[in-house]
Structures are given as C-alpha cells and as structure tokens.
C-alpha cells in the first residue's frame, strides 16, 4: 500500500509540473507563479 501511495503522489506531482509548463507556455496571465 505504501508503494502505491508513493507512486500515486509521484504521478500527481509529475502531471502537475507538466500542467504548469503547458499553462506557462500558453501565455495565460491569470496564473502568475
């Protein structure tokens, strides 16, 4: 179970970072980080 939880959190962080890159390249000014 611990391995599954770690894998799920890793996948969530990875997909979130991909989303940040995509939104950043879209030039949307609503989110400024």
From Swiss-Prot:
The 4 large subunits of the cytochrome b6-f complex are cytochrome b6, subunit IV (17 kDa polypeptide, PetD), cytochrome f and the Rieske protein, while the 4 small subunits are PetG, PetL, PetM and PetN. The complex functions as a dimer. This is Cytochrome b6-f complex subunit 8. Keywords: Electron transport, Membrane, Photosynthesis, Thylakoid, Transmembrane, Transmembrane helix, Transport. Pfam families: PetN (PF03742). GO terms for cellular component: cytochrome b6f complex; plasma membrane-derived thylakoid membrane. It is found in: Cellular thylakoid membrane. GO terms for molecular function: electron transporter, transferring electrons within cytochrome b6/f complex of photosystem II activity. Component of the cytochrome b6-f complex, which mediates electron transfer between photosystem II (PSII) and photosystem I (PSI), cyclic electron flow around PSI, and state transitions. Its main location: membrane. Belongs to the PetN family. It is a single-pass membrane protein. GO terms for biological process: cytochrome complex assembly; photosynthesis. SUPFAM superfamilies: PetN subunit of the cytochrome b6f complex. The chain crosses the membrane at residues 2-22.
